[in-house]
Amino acid sequence: VLGMACLTVQAAEPLTSLDKPEGRLDIIAWPGYIERGQTDKQYDWVSQFEKDTGCQVNVKTAATSDEMVSLMAKGGYDLVTASGDASLRLIMGKRVQPINTALIAGWGSLDPRIAKGAWFNVGGKVYGTPYQWGPNLLMYNTRVFPTPPDSWRVVFVKQDLPDGKTNQGRVQAYDGPIYIADAALFVKATQPQLGIEDPYQLTETQYNAVLKVLRDQQPLIHRYWHDATVQMNDFKNEGVAASSSWPYQANGLKAEGQPVATVFPKEGVTGWADTTMLHSEAKHPVCAYKWMNWSLTPKVQGDVAAWFGSLPVVPEGCKASALLGDKGCETNGYEQFNRIHFWKTPVAEGGKYVPYSRWTQDYIAIMGGR
């Protein structure tokens, strides 16, 4: 048993040098995060990497953080593009290993606002390489709202919208339990007496007030969304007027000439800062390090941001991609960093706060109308 314990500790020691690449790389990623030109041939940051390193890239897409965590538990993958609501679970569950940042040439070019993020720096160790970040915005139909809405109220409180029709059955909410934090920001602004400071650290009393807002919202919901493509279709063809969304959907719909726009509501927004994390039992660690390095090159950073509607973790990425253009970072919200409450896994901290396991249980019940 002792021998085994020593082995596991050693296995998690980061590499000190890179040998010959293993020829293969298996990545779990959000849809649209790793493109090889199959959707649109201009968007390809895989082919060149494969040519340069000989590492064949295989991508398994996942639509939610919970799905990523369960895929990582099954194993057989090298990397995952984990959001902050998954990263701590992966670290605590020992599914990912710390990395040696000295082996990542581009490390020094990281945005200092991201480099020290609490969602991947734990106990003096660095678990992974930042990839992209972005906000969860309020997307709305401009025909329904000639003047942009300035509050999340339009999706949380039953009301008539500016076109004179009710919002019932015309709004959406994200179907991940982490959406409880979006409701917490609304409660923080509208019920200040509850004293919510951090939407991911809710006491029992605060949490119950937030759940009430979500239960009241449930009859208004057209669909709880997680598939970006389905949400885009709902705005186009199903009469959805407002919802939380990613810049990805808004950019796609605008490109098709649809009447949509996005806004940062006055209550603030949640957001995600995603980290490429290395599986604790990765079979292709050299290819994984090569990918983490490649992922920080300014052009790759800019191209991903252009495609996904996200933001580069390397500031130079804002000026390195013809696809993103000079104004792309501004459009996607680069200056809004301080207004974003980035996703992180809610933890109990010795019983002070309601932990994520309860968020999951309760949100599933609420979505089911219970």
Locate each region found by the language model.
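A ligand-binding cleft/hinge motif common to bilobed small-molecule-binding domains
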Residues: 86-89, 244-259
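A bilobed periplasmic-binding-protein/Venus flytrap-type ligand-binding module shared by bacterial periplasmic
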Residues: 139-144, 185-188, 272-284, 303
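Conserved C-terminal helix/tail region of periplasmic/extracytoplasmic solute-binding proteins
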Residues: 339-370
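Periplasmic-binding protein-like
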Residues: 106-109, 211-217, 256-280
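Mature extracytoplasmic/periplasmic domains
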Residues: 279-343
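Early extracytoplasmic/lumenal segment of secretory-pathway proteins
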Residues: 12-90
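Extracytoplasmic ligand-binding site segments that recognize negatively charged/polar headgroups
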Residues: 34-41, 81-230
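Paired acidic/hydrophobic, glycine-rich loop segments that form the ligand-binding mouth/hinge
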Residues: 78-82, 224, 241-246, 261-262
